[in-house]
Amino acid sequence: MNPFGISCQNILQLLDIWESRLLALSEEVISNRKNIQNRSIRQILGHLFDSASNNTHRIVHLQYRENPMTFPNYATMGNNDRWIAIQDYQHENWYNLVQLWKYANLHFIHVVRNVDQTMLENQWISGEDQLISLRENIEGYLPHLQLHLAEIGELINRK
């Protein structure tokens, strides 16, 4: 039995709730309302796509590479902001970006549901003296997704 079933179900529920909510937003709301990191809703959603993509890659690598594994941590030293800028999420087609985010998460769920349970304690070196297990990586994904969706919710409700 996969220990991440509830987490996967929660991600599916968030996708169901948020896809239509995101697609209903105006251009002004998705482009001009900024969080404390000066990110628009477009940019936050792009970051969430990057998160789904990078975490999927980590899960795959952690099942076959040396342990502990060295793997780039895109979220440190401002790199996630570089990813947002280089990919120009601020000007990405909104419908396409929402679908990209949705389907990246559906694939993430598929990968998590098929993870080799014997590899859950494999680790990657995410920083100096910082090791994160495959289990911790998977368990940390949903709270990160929820944090940023709540942030988007706050921006939507800001007048």
Residue ranges with predicted function:
Residues 1, 13-15, 27-32, 77-82, ...:
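Short hydrophobic/aromatic-rich motifs at helix boundaries and adjacent loops
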Residues 1-6, 39-56, 80-98:
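Charged, low-complexity, helix/coiled-coil-prone segments
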Residues 1-29, 50, 54-61, 140-143:
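Alpha-helical bundle segments that constitute or directly flank the non-heme di-iron/ferroxidase center
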Residues 2-9, 65-67, 91-99, 128-129, ...:
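Solvent-exposed interaction patches of small proteins and small membrane subunits
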Residues 10, 14, 21, 80-120:
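Acidic/histidine-rich alpha-helical segments that form the ligand environment
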Residues 24, 47, 114:
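Conserved catalytic core of Hanks-type protein kinase domains
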Residues 31-80, 109, 123-159:
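Short, contiguous alpha-helical
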